[in-house]
């Protein structure tokens, strides 16, 4: 069973057109290298750039993974890359996946916290966690879905929801995973 999604051929084709797997080779390689699910990175990249390798945000984030240049440089240095190009799809995906993987590890192996940090930065996420726990009278293990509602920046709240939704649909469409399970795993 795959939840309530209709698996008819027409609906499936519409979903596949809406959730393409552009740059799959690059995403697959980086996902394997940094132990991240392909569907997580597909969801992140779809949300960040809709697979446009030369897009630049109003805040200066660039490429498929929408990395800020300072983050891109830090990741390139850690991986000992010489003269990396931020708009090169393979390089951008590799460094974006590396960065996301590191955020997951730094934030208690939590996909949702890593997504919030990918969008707003790890310092803000740690601050929000601390103030949310204090504000709600909780001192440990604040449930992720409750934490999501306490984030003061709507862009980050919505970003987390969009990436999780996209990852769940990719998992269902291409990896025969139950989307409800993916949402639960990521939360």
Residue ranges of model-derived segments:
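Catalytic glycan-binding domains that act on GlcNAc-containing polysaccharides
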Residues: 1-187
């Amino acid at each position: 069973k795959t939840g309530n999604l209709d698996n008819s051929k027409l609906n499936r084709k519409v979903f596949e057109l809406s959730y393409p797997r552009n740059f799959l080779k690059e995403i697959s390689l980086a996902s394997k290298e940094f132990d991240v699910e392909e569907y997580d990175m597909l969801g992140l990249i779809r949300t960040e750039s809709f697979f446009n390798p030369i897009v630049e945000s109003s805040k200066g984030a660039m490429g498929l993974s929408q990395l800020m240049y300072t983050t891109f440089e830090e990741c390139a240095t850690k991986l000992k890359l010489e003269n990396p190009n931020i708009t090169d799809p393979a390089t951008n995906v590799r460094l974006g996946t590396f960065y996301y993987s590191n955020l997951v590890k730094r934030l208690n192996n939590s996909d949702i916290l890593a997504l919030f940090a990918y969008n707003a930065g790890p310092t803000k996420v740690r601050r929000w966690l601390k103030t949310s726990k204090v504000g709600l009278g909780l001192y440990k293990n604040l449930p992720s879905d409750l934490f999501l509602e306490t984030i003061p920046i709507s862009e980050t709240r919505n970003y987390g929801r969009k990436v999780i939704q996209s990852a769940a649909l990719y998992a269902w469409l291409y990896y025969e995973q139950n989307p409800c399970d993916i949402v639960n795993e990521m939360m």
